């Protein structure tokens, strides 16, 4: 009897898929579903807190827009609102919906046929000139903004990596070394350095601070975004931490630094390679390679 029941259920599902399509799911208590999804992201998927929060917000926005209805059409309608956004933004929404619908709700059929947008590779991006970088830097109004700008440009680190740095544990001020602890399933930590230009403004900024907070850069999100708005307006092109990361990679290559070392600086090398350079002679060798390149932003 049970086998016959299971067979009937499978046959019914196949009929729905071949005729009217899969049945939609409907949720009246949106906040309850979102809360359980957030817990699923943190516990079951072991996502970073930032990613789990982003996915939670994506699920909430989607459910509010669709009035709690989860169907192939409601997903398409939601994604349609992001067609004019950057490909990376669209893909982030799609990834969040896949986590929510395909994995959390176990309804992968509702996401069928939805593809990621093409994201331009690094070589497709416009790279700022030295003159544009100088104009961007000169448009910044205080020592904190200037220190942050130069830190991104001379370390090549990811946006989130810099904002998480602990000034007491992650920075070797004597060597001007940065040991990022950023390590996720998709992104690795890196070992990098900052140059003398950055050192000047970084020390001025840290000496001006009266707090003892661990964060290397104590700044809110809105003031942080204003840095890049001012820099972009002055440069005549969009300047962001990601653009500076790409500029760093390109500039180091042109200065003769082998790709394998640029990968270490930017956290793209395997953990076994990073471990060899984390202390002692390995770290000193990395510093010699970085210093020999003579990376400059303002000169």
Q: What are these model-predicted stretches?
A:
Residues 195-238, 248:
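Active-site/catalytic core of tyrosine-dependent DNA strand-transfer enzymes
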Residues 170-173, 238, 257-277, 299:
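Short, polar N-cap/turn motifs at the start of nucleic acid-interacting alpha helices
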Residues 121-122, 130-159, 245:
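Basic, Lys/Arg- and aromatic-enriched nucleic-acid-binding interface segment
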Residues 127, 266-298:
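Catalytic-site neighborhood detector that most strongly recognizes the C-terminal catalytic loop/helix
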Residues 155, 164-204:
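Conserved tyrosine-mediated DNA breakage-rejoining catalytic core shared by Y-recombinases
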Residues 119-135, 185-197, 211-217:
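DNA breakage-rejoining catalytic core of tyrosine-based enzymes
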């Amino acid at each position: 009897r049970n086998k016959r029941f299971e067979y009937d259920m499978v046959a019914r599902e196949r009929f729905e898929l071949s005729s009217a399509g899969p049945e939609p799911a409907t949720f009246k208590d949106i906040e309850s579903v979102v809360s359980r999804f957030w817990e699923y992201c943190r516990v079951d998927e072991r996502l970073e807190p930032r990613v789990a929060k982003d996915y939670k917000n994506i699920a909430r926005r989607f459910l509010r827009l669709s009035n709690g209805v989860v169907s192939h059409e409601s997903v398409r309608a939601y994604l349609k609102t992001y067609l004019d956004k950057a490909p990376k933004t669209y893909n982030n929404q799609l990834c969040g919906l896949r986590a929510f619908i395909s994995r959390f709700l176990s309804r992968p059929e509702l996401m069928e046929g939805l593809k990621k947008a093409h994201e331009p590779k690094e070589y497709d991006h416009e790279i700022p000139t030295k003159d544009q970088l100088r104009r961007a830097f000169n448009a910044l109004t205080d020592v904190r903004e200037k220190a942050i700008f130069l830190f991104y440009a001379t370390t090549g680190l990811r946006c989130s990596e810099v904002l998480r740095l602990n000034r007491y544990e992650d920075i070797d001020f004597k060597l001007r070394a940065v040991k990022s602890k950023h390590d996720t399933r998709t992104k690795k930590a890196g070992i990098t350095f900052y140059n003398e230009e950055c050192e000047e403004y970084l020390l001025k900024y840290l000496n001006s601070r009266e707090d003892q907070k661990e964060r290397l850069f104590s700044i809110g999100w809105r003031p942080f975004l204003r840095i890049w708005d001012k820099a972009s307006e002055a440069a005549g092109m969009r300047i962001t931490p990601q653009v500076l990361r790409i500029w760093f990679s390109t500039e180091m290559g042109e200065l003769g630094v082998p790709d394998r070392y640029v990968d270490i600086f930017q956290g793209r090398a395997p953990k076994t390679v990073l471990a060899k350079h984390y202390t002692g002679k390995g770290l000193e060798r990395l510093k010699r390679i970085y210093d020999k390149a003579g990376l400059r932003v303002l000169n």
